[in-house]
Amino acid sequence: MTKRNRRTFLQTSTAVLAALSPVRAALRRGVASESFASNFDTTQSAPTVSSNEGKKPLRLGLILGIGRDPNDAIAKVHDLGLPTCQVFVDEIDSVLSGRLREALNKYQIEATSLVVGGPGREAWDFYEGPLTIGLVPRETREARIAHIKKASDFAKQCGIAAVQTHCGFIPENPNVPVYKETVAALREIAGYCKRNGQNFRYETGQETPITLVRAIQDVGLDNQGVNFDLANLILYGKANPVDAIELLGQYVQGIHAKDGLWPTNPRQLGQEVAIGKGKVDFPRIIARLKELNYRGAVTIEREISGPQQVEDVRAAKVYLEKLIA
């Protein structure tokens, strides 16, 4: 994630995808683009949640904001020839949930998760990030717990089986009070999602893989999983995803297909780039996911706007289709 707030990126993505309309007919004909709490028990373990139900093949998707027009947004996913998506919504209400569910059914698109952020300011860097992102900051924690619960209810109304979010810079030191507070908050949210019949997913990025595994095990519920954002691990300088998958693989329920470069400035994240131009080794990671019998979605994410975003998404689709085949 770059400094730009993810919500801003997702808000622009739907409008940008409107530029894809001229290629709808070709896509329908199958013509591919030529472009390339403090009382937790630290001894408990969370059972692994499988992504292999139904043994579906690996399938591609797109992350996007739906704005106030779910039909138009989901139509873009359909016209790209993608069978799945992850969705972000700004406003959570029953009217919008009905329209989103209707659009998903109409176009036969599977929404694999609802992406949740905020409320409040989130700064995507190494200095303000620890103070503003996710459930770690005390000042915004209660409001965000309430917001994620509301999002869980919204997802249930839409028939979406998972809710995911950045939980923040989870402390490396499990002995500090803020770690125990964060685990308690995560347990409360994961428990709420479980009662709604959903999985709760952690988006990788701000924490090291072993810290995330520790938090999952300390929360101790069986509906937790990981949305494995391949580039974020690099952008935050936390791990090479090729190595991280050995720690996180059993928990992976979703993938963000995104590329990036390592940080060169210790104050700023690394740079997100088009797939194939960064440091993510997609062939090795996809091969390892297959060995682990992963059967979830591989969701394309490109954090820019304008015509270049469209070109990069189309190229990523062609490239990834070859790898997941």
Pin down the residues of each PLM region:
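Active-site acidic/histidine proton-transfer and metal-coordination neighborhood
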Residues: 13-20, 68-71, 123-225, 310
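N-terminal secretory signal peptides and thylakoid transit peptides that target proteins
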Residues: 1-17
